[in-house]
Amino acid sequence: MDHLSIDLETFSSVPIQKAGAQKYIQSPDFEILLFAYSLNGAEPVCCDFAQGETLPKWVAEALLDPQCLKHAYNAPFEWDCLSRYMGRQLPPAQWRCTMFHGLYAGYTAGLDATGRALGLPEDKRKLNTGKALIRYFCVPCAPSKANGGRTRNYPHHAPERWELFKEYNRQDVTTEMEIERRLSAVPVPDFVQKEWETDLIINSRGVAIDMGMVEGALELGATVRNTLTTEAVKISGLSNPNSVKQLASWLESETGEEINGLRKDTVAKMLARDDNSPEVQRMLEIRQELGKTSTKKYDAIEQAVCRDGRVRGLLQFYGANRTGRWAGRLVQVQNLPRTYTEPLELARDLVKGRKLDALKCIYGSVPDTLSQLIRTAFIAAPGNVLIDADFSAIEARVISWLAGEEWRLEVFRTHGKIYEASASQMFGVPIDLIKKSNPEYALRQKGKVAELALGYQGSTGALINMGALDMGIPEEDLPDIVSRWRDANKRIRDLWYKVDAAAVQVITQGGSVGVSSIILAHEWDATQGTDYMTITLPSGRKLFYNAPQIGVNQWGNPSISYMGMDQTTKKWKRIETYGGKLVENCVQAIARDCLAQAIEHLEAAGLPVIFHIHDEVVIDIRPFADNEAMLAKTVEIMSRPVPWAPGLPLGADGWVGKFFKKD
């Protein structure tokens, strides 16, 4: 098997960060400028397309040769570009993505950052001149007197820069190959590689968009925003009432109190007070209305929609690399607002018809309504329907199975009412009494918040963050809820401490330790310079924790840490973890593997997935004769027993319709 490593430099007038790679590549002015390649580790060669060079015949043939694996960093981009160049969709099975391989091994997405994290020598690292060269040659430039009014820079405008750009192109191939060599000690399992290939196809399919809905929402949103801003200026006299600094200063002068920011929760708490002046109350209401992110999502859809009315590239495979879950991109479908508005069809018609007054009269807050309708902008293709199916309480099922908490598993095998069952176990009340007609039903709220907050070693702070106080639960009751939940779930509690102890053992002593259905191990390769704590999941996939260490935490106990990407600062740094967090990683990773397997089965059954969100899949397909039969087939596939997780009770539910919603 031959290996062809590739890196492309390209031009397009479409901004790739906002529009996505597929729309970028579909632009009429898109072109490949440079094509660097290396066969089987040879010195990289740069083919200068921009100056008339043509790709050697053997390279073009290699792009189609099943006996030649193509490697690239962020390979979906090269795959898309070269599929257009070759005039056909290249077989995904012939491609390998080094960026994904790095994410699989616990590193970051960036080529330079991953190279540094792996400790690549200077001559193997990405050149730091790249960003400036890309800005100069790969995107349009602003016309000026100095550049003769041109809107694009060509090689002849800066020959020395162009030669440096070619060197940069070749060096990216060198860096990619060195990273792949270092990662060869931790190969990607074949079934995970197949999932990557399926993801490539799903992202290239895209999702149909109701542009009438999007355009109507943008127009109505702008009208409402202008109206509210004008009103806010009139009330406050501020030049820019959307400015946090200006509004906070005004509120301080009106209330005589210090205002520490205007976050969503802060504004909500201030609105709940009964001593606000009418002016303050109205300004807070306007702030809350203007704070809706609805039009931002519609803006993102409009910027990313391709010529055929579909948005592509909504998901990044292994984007959440601590668990291997997908991450949302462009429109961020992973965090769309829920849909409570009813009837949805009427609301959508009013938005498409720009009926602002009617929308306000029937549904109240226009920004809130537009926010709830974002999901419905994703529609079935003409003549098709959407099938939506999602796993039921997947994380609660997985942690119950992993810990062997039998009473919980029995709940999921039968009625599935985990909130009621949890309250029953915690407070010793028969579950039959926990229903709306009885006073015991109040215990369900405590069971619910406990289930949502405490599964991963959370305590009273986790209950507060999950909204326990907002539910009316007194703060003094929280320690009792924590204690009762842990006593009712002894096997889950024990799992946290067993995993913590196993991690400490393998890091300090080496070897491997099995806990339930997972295996923790310390793996290193001196020749490649890699050092990991790994957790082998029941599926066979591994989670990687780079450069693990044991220190001492603030309570004087052993502290587990590893090198990883800080989700807040986006910097590579040492991160502390503990048993409950490791259990959370495992549970979410196992749930992810259940979803990935379901997607493979759905695809094999001729049910084309267009996107998915955590535990939910969306299919776009020609309707069957019977909608119920379509849904039943999908749910049956989602609920199939998992071979590597015997006894894990999966369940799913869903709907069939013309547009996306949260049922």
Please identify what each model-predicted range represents.
Residues 1-2, 60-64, 369-385, 600-604:
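A short acidic-Thr-Gly-centered motif at the start of a beta-strand
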Residues 1-10, 14-16, 34-36, 123, ...:
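Conserved "right-hand" nucleotidyltransferase catalytic core of DNA-directed polymerases
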Residues 27-37, 41-184, 196, 342, ...:
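Active-site-proximal helix-loop-helix substrate-binding element of RNase H-like nuclease domains
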Residues 183-195, 594-617:
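Active-site palm subdomain of RNA-directed nucleic acid polymerases
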Residues 258, 424, 429-605, 649, ...:
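Conserved catalytic core of nucleic-acid polymerases
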Residues 622-628:
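Helix N-cap motif at beta-to-alpha junctions
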Residues 630-639:
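Short amphipathic alpha-helices in soluble, non-transmembrane regions
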